[in-house]
Amino acid sequence: MLFRSVFVAPNCCFTTAEHPVDPEQRKKGLEIAKPIRIGNNVWIGAGSTILAGVTIGDDSVIGAGSVVTRSIPAGVVAVGVPCRVMRKITEEDKTRYPYFEGYLETESTGKGQV
């Protein structure tokens, strides 16, 4: 389930299927599906894999090439294999790209500038 303003870069994989680790259960063809939930304003970097049963919280960023095996909380940057939280997104992050300031200030008027 994807919510609003989710950015998914190229070559990402979302897999909801799981199979048993036990070989006898696998021989019987047993398989289950678990949902994936991606919150609002999430950015998923290129080549990331999101596994079954995972929830990614609102406003989080998943770094390129990550394999998300467990749920990620809201408002964080998470990266790696397996994906782990590196840090919270801070107020400083809002000023990291000053060339967006003119656009963000006028966005509510519908006359944004880049």
Region annotations inferred by a language model:
Residues 5-11, 59, 63-65, 75:
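Outer-envelope exported proteins of Gram-negative bacteria
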Residues 15-16, 63, 69-70, 86-88:
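Conserved acidic donor-binding loop of glycosyltransferase catalytic domains
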Residues 46-70:
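Beta-rich strand-turn-strand
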Residues 74-76, 84:
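Glycine-centered loop/turn positions within well-structured domains
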Residues 43, 61, 77-79:
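Short-chain dehydrogenase/reductase
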Residues 21, 81-114:
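Terminal amphipathic alpha-helical/low-complexity segments used for targeting or macromolecular assembly
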Residues 1-54, 88-90, 94:
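Flexible, glycine/small-residue-enriched loop-and-beta-strand segment within the central core
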